[in-house]
Design a protein with these regions (language model features):
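Sec-dependent N-terminal signal peptides
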Residues: 1-5
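Catalytic glycan-binding domains that act on GlcNAc-containing polysaccharides
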Residues: 6-126
Length: 126
């Protein structure tokens, strides 16, 4: 069984839908362009190599054989799967605010440094 699919199924079963958050972030990060590149950040969600490695570490620790490649960042569906994996592990209570700040500032984000990004994403969601 694929871990990412299990996570997505679990999120839907719990009634939580990351789609509005992901769609707002996608508009800010890449305007929906799966080929968008900004330094080491690429794809619709502007995923870094560090984030791919973190997803693979989470998958490995869960016993899954699934792994993501750097090229997967250019695939919108796989990018969204990686978003869900990161949130399921680092944001298990599904806090939208934490999800946005985590995406902007990384796993050890600074709250004050992520507030402008948080406001941008929240405006797009409303």
């Amino acid at each position: 069984m694929i871990f990412a699919s299990t996570l997505e199924a679990s999120a839907k079963k719990d009634g939580f839908d990351w789609e509005p958050v992901m769609n707002a972030i996608i508009q800010i990060e890449s305007k929906g362009n799966p080929m968008a590149v900004n330094g080491s950040y690429v794809g619709v969600l502007q995923i870094s190599p560090v984030l791919v490695k973190e997803c693979n570490n989470i998958l490995k620790s869960s016993g899954s054989n699934k792994r993501y490649s750097l090229a997967d960042r250019f695939n919108a569906t796989k990018s969204k799967e990686m978003f869900v994996i990161i949130q399921s592990f680092h944001n298990p209570l599904n806090s939208v605010e934490k999800a946005i700040c985590l995406w902007s500032g990384g796993i050890r984000y600074n709250v004050s440094k992520t507030q402008a990004y948080l406001r941008k994403v929240m405006r797009l969601m409303n």
